[in-house]
Regions:
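Long, charged, low-complexity intrinsically disordered regions
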Residues: 1-94
C-alpha cells in the first residue's frame, strides 16, 4: 500500500495518512480501506483515487470508492484543488 504520513504543523488541517490508489483494483481498494478502518487510529485520511481519464473503459475507482465509503456510512468529501481536487477524497472516521 502506498501511503505517506504528514508530520507538519499540528494546527493545519492535514490528514493523518495519505493513500494513493493509482494502479489498484477495486478489490485491492476495498481491502485497503477495510484494513485502515480495522487498524484504527486515523480520523482524517486523504485517498488519492485519480479521475480515470486514462482508463480504457472510463473511470472505475472514483465511483467504486465513493460508493463503498457511502455503503459503510463513512463521511467524505472531495479534496480542495490544491490537495488533489476531483481525483482525491478527504475521508473522516469517527
Amino acid at each position: 500500500m502506498s501511503y505517506y504520513r504528514d508530520m507538519g504543523n499540528k494546527y493545519a488541517q492535514v490528514p493523518d495518512i495519505i493513500i494513493d490508489f493509482h494502479g489498484y483494483t477495486t478489490f485491492e481498494c476495498q481491502e485497503a480501506i477495510d484494513a485502515l478502518i480495522q487498524e484504527g487510529g486515523y480520523k482524517h485520511i486523504r485517498m488519492i483515487i485519480g479521475r480515470g481519464k486514462r482508463s480504457a473503459n472510463g473511470p472505475v475507482l472514483p465511483d467504486f470508492v465513493k460508493s463503498y465509503l457511502t455503503s459503510q456510512n463513512i463521511r467524505f468529501n472531495q479534496s480542495k484543488i490544491q490537495d488533489g481536487g476531483e481525483g482525491s477524497l478527504e475521508v473522516f472516521l469517527k
